[in-house]
Amino acid sequence: MKTLLVEKNKIRANLETVKAKAGKAQVIAVLKANAYGLGLREMAQLCREASIRRFAVTEPEDAVRLRDWGFGEEEIIVLRSTANAQEIQQILQSGATATVGSYDAALALHGLAESQGMVCDVHIKVATGMGRYGFLPTEIDRILSVYRYLTNLNVTGTYTHYANAFKSVKKTQLQLDAFLSVVEKIRAAGFEPGMLSASNSEAMFGCKTDNLDAVRIGSALGGRVIAKGDHGLQRTGRLQSEISEVRWLPAGCPVGYGSAYVTKHPTRVAIIPVGSADGYMVEKARSSFGFKECFRAACSAMLSFFRRRKYYVQVNGKRVPVIGHVGVNHTAIDVTDVECGPGTVVQLDAAPLFVPASIPRQYVD
């Protein structure tokens, strides 16, 4: 049996840290990707208990789920701009706030809302550096057309998303400047941009940019941010499993794929039925980062080739080393000096985001 242990007391502490760091800015809890693997429903409840009443999701169906679970008073912002009729219907059905990132998406949303006699709240997305959803700063006329002609859309906010907050304050500030320039043009035309937001977890904890009216915080809720320094956040999410088999191996016996580890002396080895398929030892692709991060990763990999980095798990309160490469479904550990056997509980650190939803989440205080 495998479970992901989620410590609610750590999440509660993180929520208070986030609120304090946000200052006067509203906190929008980003609960996309099953709340970064921590569990959408449970995280929404913890946020509600912390008086955070604005949620953001990526998938319109998540907005429907939250409403069905009783989150009827909270504002739910769908962060993905869409022109898909089925997804638009889910947004309208749930009373969520839609993201409008193109005039085509705005037209599609307006048309369906108008046909049903509805007015949909929307946030305008401005693309200042991500290159995904959003109006380009040069498309100010299209943004203003949303205000002028699409009367079934009610603009309640405007936002952008930082691409480099985890590594470049300068680039982040340039994005903010570009965003605020668009905001000023909206106001100069006689329209209100509504609630302004730009900062994500990395920006709020790693940069000194303006928090504006609201911050959108996701990964920090689980205590996992790339930004350097001690931010007062507590990491949560531990895989828990049981030892399936214990055996003695003689000296000179290889362990795992590639024979990367060879026993130097008789070794008592335990097998845990947990591997990369369960999210253990899985991290974001290095291609999502810059040259410096990739260079550091390459150096680390080269160093590991000559001097293998050690990883540990917890067995009966003791740190036990992982030996050999982690497999898809199995991990070997050295338990020569640890009293344990089949059925002994083992805890492993894993980013909840990569732990499959099929593995139950167990919430503990």
What are the functions of these language-model segments?
Residues 2-7, 12, 104, 176-365:
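Active-site anion/phosphate-binding pocket segments in diverse small-molecule metabolic enzymes
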Residues 2-6, 10-13, 23-197:
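Active-site-proximal beta-alpha core segment in soluble small-molecule metabolic enzymes
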